[in-house]
Amino acid sequence: MLYEKFEHNINNLIGGFGLSKIAIAVSGGSDSVALLYLANIWAKKNNIELFVLSVDHNLRDQSKQEIEYIQNTANDLGLKFYSLFFDHQNNFSNLQERARKGRYDLMTSLCQKLDILVLLTAHHEDDYIENFCLRLERKSGVFGLSSSSVNWHNNTQIIRPLFNIPKSELVNYLATNNIKWFEDQSNLSTKYRRNTIRQKLAKEEVYIKDDIITQQIKVNELIENKFKPELISAIAESVKISEYGFAFLDLIKFSGFSQEVRVQLINFLLIIISGQQRSARFYSVEPILKLIRQSLDFKNTLHGCVIKRMQNKLLIYREFGKKLPESKLLLDKQLVWDNRFRITKNHDIENCVATYLSLEDYKIIKEKLDLEVLKNLSCGNHNAILFTLPIVKILEKVVAIPHISYYDNDIKSFNVSFAPDFTSRFTHFY
């Protein structure tokens, strides 16, 4: 039966953690509504408090009805309900990806406030099949083709207990129990590649899906048993990440790793140093590997980073100028700037802005800057890296560059630590 299968999955995924409360993401579609009812049975059986989270993207006319339905259902089941709102700001560029990140940011931030460690989502077997086909079409490497029923976002564990359950079983469960759900009409639009793949798969014989599932399992086993342990060792042995937000890669040790791990290792560093959330495509990393194999010094850019070879070292630092970091007002004691640096305000100072060093600012204060430590650590690349570091300004005046201990008075009012907003399912431990 469906519940027994679900119970087996969720117990294997989180059964041993001794949690007292868990959150669940519910959209109103068949998948998440089925998950809500299954999780409710399991939570009550295990004396776990279940929190229902729903995000209104304000993109469809029926979204208000869906939120209202989910709230009423949660109330009927005796569960706490939280409605969140994603503001797309009338910007429809790359909307699916932005909405996905936006709702995960909203839900995991709420989980942190509620002291909830685990968020359940309704990704099912068909979703995994579609993802595999999409990534295969995009020529993803073996790491990109792999999947997991456990992920992380914003230090919240994302659990997918429906990973091996087809959508048809979920729909049948709802229909049999006379449970209402909503159909998202955007799932029928062929402007999204995923929908086109879904429609093609629907016309295929069952054995085609079974074959894809078999391929996915083999890839996952290869990652778990071979490449993931190698990647973790590779990071420990060959990578040095500086508090100044740059990294060095030992190319002698790098040459001894498998091709798959080399690609993932470069990607790992690009994400951390750039502050971006997504990894570079496999085909865009390959030219960098080709340059490395030629054993000649080079300087290139990729994924918001400068990649520079210096004999047997590869230096990676953030590219300055192409996409400048957003200036942020230091209203609270701490903030994260450029998705990479955590700035702490040690004293109650008003009108502080975290931003980047402009050429005009540099000309004014350059005679007062001591760059000797940064110069030594970066092997002479201090001038370029200086412009990637956060500074603090008050009324357009540079008052602090904490990394190089520059302050316009004797009070050390700000501290900075390199804390990139990055979590990888391949290297995250719990």
From Swiss-Prot:
Using the chain's own numbering, where are the disulfide bonds?
Answer: none
The entry's localization annotation reads:
Cytoplasm
Q: Which domain of life is it from?
A: Bacteria
- Offer an example of a GO molecular function term for this protein: tRNA(Ile)-lysidine synthase activity
Cellular component annotations (GO), alphabetically ordered? cytoplasm
One Gene Ontology BP term is: tRNA modification
Key words of the record:
ATP-binding, Cytoplasm, Ligase, Nucleotide-binding, tRNA processing
Reaction catalysed?
cytidine(34) in tRNA(Ile2) + L-lysine + ATP = lysidine(34) in tRNA(Ile2) + AMP + diphosphate + H(+)
What residues does ATP bind to?
27-32
Does Coiled coil appear among the keywords? no
**UniProt main location, coarse:** cytoplasm
Instruction: Mark the transmembrane ranges.
Output: none
Protein EC: 6.3.4.19
UniProt keyword Phosphoprotein, yes or no = no
> What HAMAP family is this protein classified in?
tRNA_Ile_lys_synt (MF_01161)
Q: Which NCBIfam families has this protein been placed in?
A: lysidine_TilS_N
For this chain, the family text in UniProt reads: Belongs to the tRNA(Ile)-lysidine synthase family.
Comment on protein domains = The N-terminal region contains the highly conserved SGGXDS motif, predicted to be a P-loop motif involved in ATP binding.
Instruction: Give a short account of what the protein does.
Output: Ligates lysine onto the cytidine present at position 34 of the AUA codon-specific tRNA(Ile) that contains the anticodon CAU, in an ATP-dependent manner. Cytidine is converted to lysidine, thus changing the amino acid specificity of the tRNA from methionine to isoleucine.
* Protein name according to UniProt: tRNA(Ile)-lysidine synthase
Q: Which organism is it from?
A: Rickettsia bellii (strain OSU 85-389)
User: Mind giving the lineage of the organism this protein is from?
Assistant: Bacteria, Pseudomonadati, Pseudomonadota, Alphaproteobacteria, Rickettsiales
This protein's gene is called tilS
